Regions:
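Structured beta-strand-rich core segments of catalytic domains in phosphoester-bond hydrolases
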Residues: 53, 111-198
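Bacterial Sec-dependent N-terminal signal peptides
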Residues: 1-43
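Extracytoplasmic/secreted cell-surface and envelope-processing proteins
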Residues: 58-59, 115-118, 142-143, 201-204, ...
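Active-site beta-strand/loop signature of hydrolases that rely on acidic residues for catalysis
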Residues: 48-53, 78, 83-86, 90-117, ...
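Metal-dependent phosphoester-hydrolase catalytic domains
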Residues: 224-234, 242-379
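N-terminal, active-site-proximal structural segment of metallo-dependent hydrolase catalytic domains
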Residues: 36-130, 134-146, 343-348, 362, ...
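Second-shell loop/turn segments in exported
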Residues: 74-81, 102-108, 135-136, 166-168, ...
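Active-site His/acidic residue clusters
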Residues: 64-67, 193-207
Length: 379
């Protein structure tokens, strides 16, 4: 019996004072046991999308708006069945973009009024996702506006406002900018700008001053947020009717491709950049680098793909040590097969539009959606 007790004492002594291998094993076991009881961090995917829906009009005339071509008796024969199909199609796309979870935020361009947003969120298949929305009420002559759909469990709305674009050189009135801010689950404030800048009607060069004018107003509003928020988190999205290398984005917003991370997939072809090169007051274009590759874009014009739709973020949102961040590798153009059709004139594929000219196609839009994933880190 004494021999057994002595052996037990030796075993305990070996655990306490034994060799290094024993001590390491005990240490590992201790931390494994502790980790069972320690609360684990929870990471939530927070998907943000943007889409120009191409003329989402109802079938009724809005007073003082030039929406006559989208009435049942007009040349386009825009009737209730076509309108209802368009709503269902948009709901289908938004659901598909979200995959297994609904996108947290969706910026929409070319939506006519509150009626179409209410029908989309409450009278289409999208009603199952319980979206809420805010939108502008612009002086645009055609009556098209921008909107933001949001999931209330991920984004608590604090405020929203329309930012008007004063007339410039007697140009016709254009769409307001939409500024929305809300609280994330982390308690941080997120500022979102949804934009649809003046079109290229009349020529890209001739119409450029109007886009520069709108971009300058956007820049001023964004700068105000960047310099007043203690921890500015800004997302800018929408149809700029300009490409990443145009002046509105390159010179006015000064949005450029993010620095390359040392763990980036592009490290083989791009030099690594120190994370310290990120500036919280600077704007970064999540799709700028990809836009330089062939056949990449959200819009096809005369057989050439290009990026008219943009996702731009402040530097804080690229800091992976934070609790809400993204990276350019997460940003994509949504190329679901049913959104595309054969380009019979130039070859390849093109967006499957609702109308091609005046002919009804029954498709979705002349633009493809874009999106990115943020990581929301909860304690």
């Amino acid at each position: 019996m004494s021999l057994l007790k002595n052996k037990r004492r030796i075993s305990l002594r070996q655990l306490k004072y034994g060799n290094s291998e024993t001590r390491v094993a005990v240490t590992i076991l201790f931390f494994v046991i502790c980790s069972w009881n320690a609360p684990a961090q929870e990471n939530i995917r927070f998907r943000v999308a943007c889409w120009n829906t191409e003329n989402l009009f109802d079938t009724h005339h809005d007073s003082l708006k030039n929406d006559y071509e989208f009435l049942p008796n007009a040349m386009r024969h825009w009737n209730y069945n076509r309108y209802k199909k368009k709503l269902s199609d948009i709901a289908r796309v938004i659901t598909a973009i979200g995959e297994w979870n609904a996108p947290a935020l969706i910026g929409l361009c070319e939506v006519e009024n509150d009626t179409v947003l209410r029908d989309l969120t409450h009278r289409s298949p999208l009603q199952e996702l319980d979206y809420r929305y805010v939108m502008t009420d612009s002086p645009d002559l055609r009556g098209i506006d921008v909107a933001l759909l949001y999931q209330r469990d991920l984004f608590k709305l604090l405020s929203s406002r329309s930012i008007s674009i004063p007339m410039f050189r007697q140009h016709r009135p254009t769409r307001d900018l939409l500024h929305v801010n809300g609280l994330l689950l982390t308690g941080d404030t997120l500022d979102v700008f949804v934009c649809h800048l003046p079109s290229r009607s009349g020529g890209a060069k001739e119409s450029e001053p109007y886009r520069l004018h709108a971009a300058q107003i956007l820049r001023t509003e964004v700068d105000s947020v960047l310099h007043t928020r203690l921890h500015p988190q800004v997302i800018i999205m929408g149809d700029f009717n300009d490409y990443p290398n145009n002046k509105s984005i390159r010179k006015i917003l000064e949005a450029e491709a993010p620095p390359i991370r040392s763990d980036s997939l592009d490290i083989a072809t791009h030099p690594a950049t120190s994370p310290s090169s990120l500036s919280p007051l600077k704007l970064y274009h999540l799709l700028a680098r990809k836009a330089k590759t062939a056949n990449f874009g959200s819009y096809k014009y005369h057989g050439e793909w290009g990026l008219l739709d943009h996702l731009i973020v402040s530097g804080t949102l690229l800091n992976t040590s934070g609790n809400f961040f993204t990276h350019e590798e997460k940003a994509k153009v949504c190329q679901l097969p049913f959104l595309l059709t054969d380009d019979k004139k130039y070859g390849g594929k093109e967006p499957f539009r609702t109308y091609k000219g005046m002919k009804y196609q029954g498709g979705f839009s002349d633009h493809l959606p874009i999106y990115t994933d943020f990581e929301l880190v909860l304690p």
